[in-house]
Structure formats: structure tokens, C-alpha cells
Amino acid sequence: MSVNRILVINPGSTSTKIGVFDNERPVLEETIRHDEEQIGKYKRIIDQYEFRKETILEVLHSHGINISKLNAVCGRGGLLRPIEGGTYTVNDAMLEDLKNGFSGHHASNLGGILAYEIASGLNIPAFIVDPVVVDEMEPIARISGIAGMERKSIFHALNQKAVARKVAEELNHKYEDLNLLVTHMGGGITVGAHKKGKVIDVNNGLNGEGPFSPERAGTVPVGQLVEMCFSGEYYRDEMVKKLVGQGGLVSLIGTNDAIKVEQMVEKGDPEATLIYKAMAYQVAKEIGGASAVLHGKIDAIVLTGGLAYSKILVDEIKERVDWIADVIVHPGEDELQALAEGALRVLREEEAPKEYIVREKETVARG
């Protein structure tokens, strides 16, 4: 089998994770920490790309990586327009949306730009894979009870789809042939209904929908939320933080560290026990609802993300949902590996690269 060498880039707010893979095998994985003073020199996140590019190339050189031997560069997908899942070639339309922050400004927007900047000089392809804006929801799933307020698909697409593919392989099937309920449990929690390779419904784990998590509120009583918003006690930013960042375990028990909460549970703390069980309860309830989306025809339930290392949490969830389907646990997440595998599927011609096309304010994914 021929070897494809792939450089993978995953930018964060103060660091850039890089990996070099020979097919699926990691040759190098490193987290480059950026000095906050250096980062602070740039008014816009997007202006950091040249600095980060040079830093990446220096690190690769220091490890003896000859970039002329690369076959592709793959970056973390940023805040683009809604697109279907898959591996996309970085093109001019995508670069424009990433640079202009079409759906928001975030360090992940640098992923596609850095991949393109490095790949173009080597005359090799640049890709992104399954960004958080992946949207494969069916029309019926978009409807909310208020006109003009559609439900949106924002979830852990990269890890959910990567783990779903691994589970399909373990079950000796193609991802596109299975119905799976995949739950990513980390700082946020999302439950996706995967129908034959498409995530046809999923809770918006960022903007207050679904189970509460270590630092997000999830679905809350809307009437009380409205009253709080107009009480005159809080600014808008404060309310947003209550939903994302200071919600969930942070609000209820004062920490987003699930390990600490689990230790409290093991010591018999009644409040911690109730709250931790409530989080598991809400995850199970979301899984149960998602099972109805797939008419109860579920090949497996998958639990993944950092919280899937918690035996207490996993056991609580299993007790409530294992009657629906077998529960398969894949703890943690490996974004670099997932990005490499997405690029590899295209290089091996197992799937065609998709093209990001903007037409009349719409995005069309063309495979």
C-alpha cells in the first residue's frame, strides 16, 4: 500500500496543534504554545496566520520533517456557511468566508487558511474536514414553535462522524449503511441521530439546547429565562455566559471539572450525586428522543468525548438507554487523527472531495 504523508493543523486560541501522519500512523504530534503577548499584537485573529505559518514550518524543520514529501495538508474547519459533512478542498470562496468571518471569528478559521498557504507552495491539495457548521438536518427537524426561529445544527461534527466511522468498521459495516445515535460528552454535550451517514437531527450544544454539561446550561425553562433576561439585573453578555461558559456544573456546583465532581460523588456528597445523576438523566433523555427520530431502528448507541471516561456517568446513562440498542463507548477525542483520516479517504479515492460553492448567499456542497 502506498504511503500518503499528511500534515494536519488544528489552531486554538493560544496554541496550534499539528500532526504529521503516514496514512493513519502518526509520525509527529505536537502542541505549539503561542506567547499571549505575541498573539496580542494582532487586532484580528485572522491576522495571525503568517506568524502561525512560520512557527509551524520552524517546528517541522526542527523535527527533521521534509515538507516536500507531503501529499496533502488538512486544517480544522472554521465557521463557514452551513454545509454537509465530508472532506472539502480549500478554495477561494472558502478562504474569503474564513477571512471575513462569515459565521463568526474563531481561531479554527485559521485552519483552512494555514492549510492552503502551506499546500499551495508545494502544489499539493489543502482540505478541511467536518467543521462545526456541518448541517444535514431534515426540514422537519428545523421547525420550532416560533415563526422565523429555526433550529440550527451546531455540534461536535468532526469527532461524532470520526467515531461513527470507527464503530461502523468494528461492526463490519459502512457508516453510510447504519443508523447510530452518537453522543459527544465534553465541555458541551451533543446527541446526533446519524441516519445512513447523515446527521439528520442534533441538539445545538452551543446555544442552549439539550442536556446541561460541565459548562453549558442546555435546555432551561424558557419562561423563567425570559423573566431573568428582562429583570434589569443582567447585561446581555452576562446572560450569554449563563448559557455557555458559566452554566451546567459550573452554575450548579461551582466547577467544570467532572473529575472533581466524580470524586465528590464517590465520597458520598448528596448534592454532587444528585447533580451528576441529573446530567446523566438528561443525556439519556436526549438519546431517547433521538431514537424516535430514527423510528427506533438503531444499530448502536455511541458514547464519546472526555466525559465518556467517567464510569459513573456512563453506567448511569447505560441503565436508562441500553434497552434501545447496544451501547458502545469510545472515550476521548482525537481531532488530529480524524482530520488525517478525512484527507486520507480522499487521497485513496474512497470518497470524492467536496467543493465549497457560494451562490446567491447560499452554500452548495458539490461532491
Curated annotation (Swiss-Prot):
Q: Look up the signal peptide feature and give its range.
A: none
What biological processes does GO assign it? acetate metabolic process
| GO MF, any single term | butyrate kinase activity
Does the keyword Nucleotide-binding belong to this entry?
Answer: yes
Q: Would the keyword DNA-binding be found if you checked this record's keyword annotation?
A: no
| Enzyme Commission number(s) | 2.7.2.7
Q: Which UniProt keywords apply?
A: ATP-binding, Cytoplasm, Kinase, Nucleotide-binding, Transferase
Q: Where in the cell is it found?
A: Cytoplasm
**What is one Pfam family matched by this protein?**
Acetate_kinase
* Catalytic activity of the protein: butanoate + ATP = butanoyl phosphate + ADP
What's in the GO CC field? cytoplasm
Q: Which InterPro entries match?
A: Aliphatic_acid_kin_short-chain, Aliphatic_acid_kinase_CS, ATPase_NBD, Butyrate_kin
- Give the family per the record: Belongs to the acetokinase family.
- List the HAMAP family hit by this protein, alphabetically: Butyrate_kinase (MF_00542)
Provide the protein name.
Answer: Probable butyrate kinase
Q: Which organism is it from?
A: Bacillus anthracis
Taxonomic lineage is: Bacteria, Bacillati, Bacillota, Bacilli, Bacillales
Task: Identify the gene encoding this protein.
Answer: buk
